[in-house]
């Protein structure tokens, strides 16, 4: 027994109890409860959380490094594609300028050729930037897949032991509530849980230290990687700009003394079909605006047509009125009142209108002569009555002087044209009508001659002759 270690049965029973199924189930229960509390975001013990503040800061830095390295890798890939596209477009522009320069034999053609060569050279030198970028991308991917992945595994194990440790703390807190040191009640159970807490804390502290060290090393290695790779890229970029600027400066020196040109850059190229569509759209809008400005649509009964019809009707009515006046005037001339006939101007009353009629043309003379014959037959002839009239009253009244104008001059006759047109007849009738309307009413005729004519039959019929003593009245009175 001297060469062997001896353990009491109490310790052996305790060791066997720790390995029992019940102990494992209790341990898993509290670990699961802690994981559930963390997943649901429930509030934990503030002292336990404060003890892991430095670890949480390191974890935050680790997640930042992981995220930024992923973004950097994507940006490098996109930057390489953009450089390739830019070099391709620059090369195409250089070729285009060279081809146009060969066709142009002026100084502008030489300038385009030189500029095209410079652009082609610049595009080739720009592709040299892809080498350090490709190397940079490979280093970043290696850093992500090696250093960050290893640190991530360590962090995951540390999180597992931290959950186990905090679960053991919850278990010990629950057992301590039933502990009674005076009665030694639950003492063995409390000691067993306390031992489990110490073991979990030991494992957790070890992994906590590993995580902090790896995160610090990861940050430093990332700084070294960026400084090394960016220095290579910076050197290549400086060489590229140096060569390009030297080439451009040489071309600029060769262009001195050339006549400057003013170039207009087209911002966008329009398709001919698009121009046609825009032109048609402008025409349509112009038509719509013109229709909007145009007057309202015509009414069912046009006022202008009605006005024209009324004016035509008035014209026809005026013509008919004048014609009726003309006919009426001829009739009235021949069949006037008896007072005018007895006024001493029977021939003038009948022959007056015919004397003022214009002489028609050769084609209408027959009609005019026929009308004159008709009118003359209807009037009083110079028969016995005319001769008797002249014997009694005399021939002075038939030879009246022509009417004088306002200034003592005779009334000028209207100039009769050689034609006998309807328009001239209408004008003549209008003038006669106006003259007849403007003439004042004639004074009452002297009826003495009339009473003298019938004095033989009735001497007392003339009241004006009563009391007169001249020879004529004495003869009548006798």
Swiss-Prot record:
Gene3D superfamilies: Arfaptin homology (AH) domain/BAR domain (1.20.1270.60)
Subcellular location: Cytoplasm, Cytosol; Golgi apparatus membrane; Cytoplasmic vesicle, Secretory vesicle membrane; Cytoplasmic vesicle, Secretory vesicle, Synaptic vesicle membrane
Entry's Gene Ontology cellular component terms: cytosol; Golgi membrane; secretory granule membrane; synaptic vesicle membrane
UniProt keyword Cytoplasm, yes or no: yes
Residues covered by the AH domain: 50-253
Membrane topology: Peripheral membrane protein
Composition skew (Basic and acidic residues), residue ranges: 306-317
Region feature Disordered, mapped onto this chain: 306-365, 398-422
GO molecular function, one term: membrane curvature sensor activity
GO biological process, one term: regulation of neurotransmitter secretion
UniProt xrefs under InterPro entries: AH/BAR_dom_sf, AH_dom, Islet_autoAg_Ica1/Ica1-like, Islet_autoAg_Ica1_C
Keyword Membrane recorded: yes
Alphabetized UniProt keyword annotations: Cytoplasm, Cytoplasmic vesicle, Golgi apparatus, Membrane, Neurotransmitter transport, Synapse, Transport
Coiled coil: none
Expression by tissue: Predominantly expressed in brain, pancreas and stomach mucosa. High expression also found in stomach muscle and testis.
Entry-linked SMART domains: Arfaptin, ICA69
Disruption phenotype: 129/SvJ mice lacking Ica1 do not display an obvious phenotype and age normally, while NOD mice without Ica1 develop diabetes and display sudden mid-life lethality but are resistant to cyclophosphamide-induced disease acceleration.
Function statement: May play a role in neurotransmitter secretion.
Protein name, as recorded: Islet cell autoantigen 1
Organism: Mus musculus
Gene name linked to the record: Ica1
